[in-house]
A protein has these predicted regions:
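Hydrophobic secretory-pathway targeting helix
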Residues: 1-38, 175, 192
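Short, aromatic-rich amphipathic segments at membrane interfaces
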Residues: 127-178
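N-terminal pre-first-transmembrane soluble regions of secretory-pathway and organelle membrane proteins
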Residues: 1-18, 141, 145-152, 156-161, ...
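Long, solvent-exposed extracytoplasmic domains/loops
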Residues: 48-147
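Juxtamembrane extracytosolic/periplasmic "stalk" immediately C-terminal to the first targeting helix
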Residues: 38-45, 200-206
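Juxtamembrane interface at the cytosolic side of transmembrane helices
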Residues: 2-12, 162-213
Length: 213
């Protein structure tokens, strides 16, 4: 095979791959834009704003994310992660001794059992048990709302991270396409400069030296 023909074939193949990588990059870019726009739209509709810096408590000021985004409206996945973990998470820890919704359910069930037994026995601590049950019920409702919102915000953060990964993949695809384009153009230039008669890896013909008599 002629060297020029081989260069042209490889160059055309490289251009084809470069075009394919551009298409792949466009798909990744489209997915990244969709994820970012979707997250921004959904979070903006919630109308959540970080507390201003001068209203943060000492515990809240110890959270770098709350200080960084103080007073800002929540519109990005990263902000959603900070609000979920550093703000809601902090307040959930201080509610009901850090117990979860499921753990408070166990406490609530136990108190109901104790209250029923106390009422049957006519015990003197019925009012106290009723107050404890009311407090735990209120705490459990608060924790449920907090955990639900926290879960939704973390889901938005995860979706935004998928968009970020897609954007990174698009950058890699575009970079690889650019590299292949340059190599293909270099191959075409080399093919243009190579004479048509030059063969690729042509075998050397052994010279026969006449024997001396």
């Amino acid at each position: 095979m002629k060297r020029r023909t081989l260069d042209i074939l490889f160059s055309i193949g490289g251009l084809g791959l470069a075009g394919l990588l551009v298409v792949v990059g466009m798909v990744f870019t489209s997915n990244a834009n969709f994820a970012n726009d979707y997250v921004k739209t959904q979070l903006s509709q919630q109308n959540i704003t970080f507390k201003p810096l001068n209203t943060l408590t000492a515990e809240e000021k110890a959270k770098p994310g709350l200080v960084k985004y103080a007073g800002q409206k929540l519109t990005t996945g990263k902000q959603a992660e900070v609000y979920a973990n550093e703000f809601i998470g902090l307040h959930l820890e201080s509610t009901a001794g850090g117990k979860t919704y499921a753990e408070l359910g166990t406490v609530q069930t136990d108190l109901r059992t104790q209250l029923a037994e106390a009422q049957k026995a006519g015990a003197a601590n019925v009012a106290d048990l009723q107050k404890q049950l009311a407090d735990v019920t209120a705490q459990r409702e608060t924790v449920f709302k907090g955990e639900t919102l926290r879960g939704l915000l973390l889901t938005s953060y995860g979706f935004s991270e998928m968009g970020a990964k897609a954007a990174q993949a698009a950058t890699v695809a575009y970079s690889a396409a650019a590299l292949l384009l340059l190599l293909s153009l270099a191959g075409l230039i080399h093919a243009y400069r190579t004479p048509k008669t030059v063969a690729f890896a042509a075998p050397e013909i052994e010279r026969k030296v006449p024997a001396l008599v």
